[in-house]
Design a protein with these regions (language model features):
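C-terminal lobe and adjacent flexible extensions of AdoMet/dcAdoMet transferase-like proteins
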Residues: 191-197
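A short SAM/SAH-binding and catalytic strip from SAM-dependent methyltransferases
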Residues: 102-114
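Conserved class I S-adenosyl-L-methionine
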Residues: 1-37, 50-51, 70-73, 147-154, ...
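A short glycine-rich, Lys/Arg-flanked "PGG" loop and its adjoining helix->strand segment in the class I
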Residues: 116-131
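A short acidic, Gly/Pro-enriched loop at the edge of an enzyme's catalytic core
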Residues: 91-103
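C-terminal alpha-helical "lid/dimerization" subdomain adjacent to the S-adenosyl-L-methionine
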Residues: 17-21, 133-191
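Class I SAM-dependent methyltransferase SAM/SAH-binding core
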Residues: 40-92
């Protein structure tokens, strides 16, 4: 189960992510948050709170995380006073329809068990005209695509991490209007911006 795996690695997560943070992930996190409009914001998969440092100080909203152990670390991190933390799965959000002006996630949907259900929930809880932004590693185009298809056999078994998802296509199929896709790192990372209609 994905939740149990993240509970088991929570204490080591930031150590593992450290090199990636230094090699450009910090910049990508900042770029992701820069795409968000002001208003009531939802973060899906806040993890240990690595994005909190990039939140504008006047941010208000909710940061969700399904791993209790990750959330126990996140709660110790400084964050804007208007941001609440909540343990929850992306596929079953406990919010009223049109509760948020925007939602975002960074490197989360590769591990979401039922992404179509989670995208449907984002479409429901973000108001019409609102924004959904994802920073995700995805199946790259070209010669790397089949390589990632092969790697996916092992990454899903070992880490429950899907490295070959076509995330922008899945978002579109769920009814989100994809307005921009920025490709990074040979297409392995995508910054995807959607509008809720």
């Amino acid at each position: 189960m994905v939740q149990a795996r993240y509970d088991s690695v929570a204490q080591h997560y930031e150590g593992v992510m450290g090199p990636f943070q230094r090699w450009g992930l910090v910049k990508l996190r900042k770029e992701t948050l820069s795409q968000l409009p002001p208003g009531n914001i939802l973060e899906i998969g806040a993890g240990t709170g690595l994005n909190f440092v990039h939140y504008p100080q006047d941010t208000r909203g909710v940061a969700t995380e399904f791993s209790r152990e990750m959330l126990n670390i996140a709660v110790t991190k400084p964050r804007p006073g208007g941001v609440q933390l909540l343990q929850n799965r992306a596929e079953d959000l406990p919010f009223k329809t049109h509760s948020f002006d925007a939602a975002f996630a960074t490197l989360v949907f590769c591990s979401v068990e039922h992404p179509a259900a989670a995208f449907a929930e984002l479409r429901r809880v973000v108001r019409p005209g609102g924004t959904v932004v994802l920073l995700e590693h995805v199946r790259p185009h070209g010669i790397l695509g089949p390589v990632f298809d092969f790697l996916n056999v092992f990454s899903t078994r070992l880490f429950e991490d899907h490295v070959n998802r076509r995330t922008a296509k899945m978002m579109s199929e769920a009814g989100l209007e994809v307005v921009d896709v920025k490709s990074r790192l040979l297409g392995i990372i995508n910054l995807i911006k959607c509008r809720v209609s």
